[in-house]
Design a protein with these regions (language model features):
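N-terminal secretory signal peptides that target proteins for export/translocation
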Residues: 1-6
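Carbohydrate-interacting regions of secretory-pathway proteins
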Residues: 28-342
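Bacterial N-terminal signal peptides
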Residues: 10-21
């Protein structure tokens, strides 16, 4: 083949290849791929991620409280996303003894409408007497910005969140919850009494939030968590930094200083229960840094979405600092916040 004929042939192949690539059908999962902020039935915060990896679809979900968990199945067909979640139910006899464990599967279907998601959840009732069907919504979470250069971030004047005398500047997140919070000797203390085994039923103690709301900031505080106790510090009411008696345990995304169920500390830096510990937390551009007792355990890591118990799934909103009060006794002092100055 001479040079001119080869050039024409090569050009034709190139154009044909470009046209073929242009005309290739989009993946059916393309409209659903990414992360979604959900408002689940009851108005609570949820989160969904759908991704295609190695030729198959996968996903994970946060449903109100608890942890981000993998979905049991993900299927996309005819413009409809179908996912399933499985949870166990214990069947007990009259004496309260577990006699049977069953797995219940709920199905969630979704359609994309622009940057919105319209979803329907169908779940069996726990006693097996039929199904419950609920509709809810979501919206696409914008892409994460680059990790900020924290050396260039400017922080404003410090704001003392707790005056050491009373609960001025704070109120219960749930107005009808029992209040275990009090100012005692310059310390913000939560006396949440957990029922003893076989004793009284669980009492719902309230979470405590600041009256003021904030965007990005640096927050420093001291915390004292007794043995086997549990609390949390919610940043903007959306992201929980875990407070837990986890001394001596391997690192885990549910242990002291973790971003609950999302980011595992790089090293275990907690102290034994009953000792005062320091937390230095920076939240900028949806990236978080946590310094526990002088050791950086989360270093400017991206936050992919809300955590369990969030007030909202909308990460664009300013929000309060809120302290978890329903899981056990805990004490805080020297809570100081410095907002980012843009």
């Amino acid at each position: 083949m001479n040079a001119s004929r080869w050039t024409r042939f090569s050009t034709a192949l190139l154009v044909t290849g470009l046209l073929t690539a242009t005309a290739a059908p989009a993946s059916p999962g393309e409209p659903f791929a990414g992360r979604w902020a959900l408002t689940i039935p009851g108005g609570h915060a949820g989160w969904l991620e759908i991704k295609a990896e190695n030729g198959w679809y996968d996903g994970s979900m946060l449903w109100g409280w608890g942890s981000v968990l993998p979905l049991a199945s993900v299927t996309i067909a005819d413009g409809v996303l179908t996912v399933t979640r499985v949870h166990e139910v214990e069947r007990k006899d009259a004496a309260g003894q577990v006699v049977r464990q069953q797995q219940l599967t709920e199905t969630i279907t979704a359609r994309v409408e622009g940057d919105k998601l319209k979803l329907t959840r169908t779940a069996p009732r726990e006693d097996g007497s039929g199904f419950v069907s609920e509709e809810f919504t979501g919206f696409r979470i914008p892409p994460l910005p680059p990790a900020p250069d924290l050396q260039r971030v400017h922080f404003g004047e410090p704001i003392t969140l707790f005056n050491g005398r009373d609960l001025s500047g704070w109120h219960l997140l749930e107005p009808n919850a029992e209040n275990g919070w009090a100012a005692e000797g310059g310390v913000l203390v939560n006396h949440a009494i957990e029922p003893s085994e076989g004793g009284e039923s669980h009492r719902h103690f309230g979470n405590l939030r600041t009256d003021a709301t904030f965007s990005d900031f640096r927050l420093t505080l001291e915390v004292n968590v007794p043995a086997k106790s549990n609390s949390g510090v919610y940043l903007r009411g959306i992201y929980e930094v875990q407070v837990l008696d986890s001394y001596g345990h391997p690192v885990d995304s549910h242990n002291m200083g973790a971003l609950y169920s999302r980011i595992t500390p790089s090293v275990a830096a907690e102290k034994p229960a009953g000792e005062w510990q320091t937390l230095d937390i920076t939240l900028v551009d949806r990236h978080v840094t946590v310094i526990l007792n002088g050791t950086t355990i989360i270093d400017n890591q991206p936050v992919l979405g809300c955590t369990g118990g969030a007030m909202t799934s909308d990460e664009s909103l300013p929000g309060p600092i809120y302290l978890q009060g329903d899981h056990g006794t805990v004490s805080f002092r020297n809570l100081v916040l410095r907002p980012v100055v843009k």
